[in-house]
């Protein structure tokens, strides 16, 4: 699981299915199911097309 120290305050920590931690470049970002991609707050992940939609 992610801790506050994992990523800077301007980023969001995402955990991959393998349990690895990564940083999303958005503050309060939304992690996609793959744990690799992420979207800005207020959007959702389009898993099929790997993009963010409103």
Curated annotation (Swiss-Prot):
The keyword Acetylation does not apply. It comes from the Eukaryota. Six disulfide bonds are present. PANTHER family: GRANULIN, PROGRANULIN. Pfam families: Granulin. Brain. It is found in: Secreted. Keywords: Disulfide bond, Neuropeptide, Secreted. This is Pars intercerebralis major peptide D1. GO terms for cellular component: extracellular region.
């Amino acid at each position: 699981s992610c801790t506050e120290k994992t990523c800077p305050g301007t980023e969001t920590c995402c955990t991959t299915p393998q349990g690895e931690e990564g940083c999303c470049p958005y503050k309060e970002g939304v992690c996609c199911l793959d744990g690799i991609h992420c979207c800005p707050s207020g959007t959702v992940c389009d898993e099929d097309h790997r993009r963010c939609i409103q």
